[in-house]
Structure formats: C-alpha cells, structure tokens
C-alpha cells in the first residue's frame, strides 16, 4: 500500500491490518505535522517502507522529489508537481490509473477552499491554482482534509444568497450525515 501524508500512524496501521495490506511507500506533500506526524512510527512498524519527500519536509526521505520527478510503487507511477503557496515546498502527486487522473494535492486546494499561506506566497498559490486548473476536468482531486461543509458555510457567510453553494452544502451535509466522505471531488 501507498500512504500519502500520514498525520497519525495508528489509524493507518489499523486500516492496513484490517485489510491485510503491507505498507511499502509513504509520500508527503509538505512538512506540517498533521501530514508527517505518523511517518516515524510507520517506518518503525514497516521498516522496508520507502519514504518519498522534498528535502524541506523534515523527514529522512529515501527518495528526494522536486517538480517534474516521477515516483512509483505497486505499478502506480505519479508525476510530482510543485504546488507551492500553502508552504514553499508543497508537492502534489498526479496519477493516471486506467485513463483516470487522480491528484493528491495536500493543503494547496480543498473542496470549496484552499490552505492558508504559511511559508509560501500568495503569488505561488495563484500559480499553483492555474497549474491545477490545467488538469482535465474529470480529474479526481484528493485534498488532505475534509473541510467541504465548513468551507461552504464560510462562503455562505459572505454570499448568503449563492444558490450553488447552498445546494453544495446540502449535498455535503447529506453525505457526511450518512458517514460518507465528500472527497474526492
């Protein structure tokens, strides 16, 4: 299995054990603790795990990545894109699985929102949005956090009559009330 941005080890280990999977690779998008907090414990539990990260992600990576790198595991190859803005060294992983594009974009882009600018710049974030916007429309986006409903509530506090946001919030709340995710988008 490949794990992206393990903020905690325990839920990952529980999932792997429940589904009888072996962790072989960890990929990180950026250095914030809620994305790398479980890396060390996962490496202890699965010592053969291959860690893929940018040099500024504060982990001891086996493979250093940058914009344009390619990473692979279990027959899946991903293009690495620099999508800085939230942080100065934020990476995304773009996979093509059976003709369907999948983008793991960390905190650069959320459903109905984006990550705050910390060590990056607003100009970098804008360039990253333009780059991500160039992906095919049918690309599935996997943001790192499930903030859809809260982002839509915030949007509605600014534009309370926005019918598209109202409808999207109803759908998001229905999905989460049933125990389902609103992601990917």
Predicted regions and their residues:
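Generic enzyme active-site microenvironment
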Residues: 3, 105, 143
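Short beta-strand-to-turn element immediately C-terminal to the catalytic PLP-Schiff-base lysine
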Residues: 4, 94-96, 155-156
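Active-site metal-binding loops of divalent metal-dependent hydrolases
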Residues: 6-8, 31, 56, 86-87, ...
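Active-site HxH/HxHxD metal-binding segment of metal-dependent hydrolases
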Residues: 6-82, 101
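Accessory terminal helices/loops
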Residues: 127-140, 147-185
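Short active-site oxyanion
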Residues: 1-2, 23-25, 138-140
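Ligand/cofactor pocket segment of small-molecule handling proteins
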Residues: 70-82, 87-122
């Amino acid at each position: 299995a490949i794990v992206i941005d393990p903020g905690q080890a325990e839920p990952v280990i529980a999932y792997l054990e429940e589904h009888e999977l072996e962790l072989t690779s960890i990929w990180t998008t950026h250095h914030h603790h809620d994305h790398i907090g479980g890396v060390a414990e996962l490496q202890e539990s699965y010592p053969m795990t291959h860690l893929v990260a940018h040099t500024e992600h504060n982990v001891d990576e086996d493979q250093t990545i940058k914009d344009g790198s390619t990473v692979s595991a279990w027959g899946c190859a991903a293009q690495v894109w620099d999508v800085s803005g939230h942080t100065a060294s934020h990476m995304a992983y773009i996979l093509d699985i059976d003709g369907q594009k999948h983008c793991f974009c960390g905190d650069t882009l959320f459903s109905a929102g984006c990550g705050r600018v910390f060590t990056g710049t607003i100009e970098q974030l804008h360039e990253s949005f333009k780059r991500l916007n160039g992906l095919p429309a049918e690309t599935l986006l996997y943001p790192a956090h499930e903030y859809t409903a809260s982002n839509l509530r915030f949007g509605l506090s600014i534009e309370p009559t926005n019918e598209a946001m109202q409808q999207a919030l109803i759908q998001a709340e229905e999905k989460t009330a049933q125990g389902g995710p609103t992601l990917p988008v």
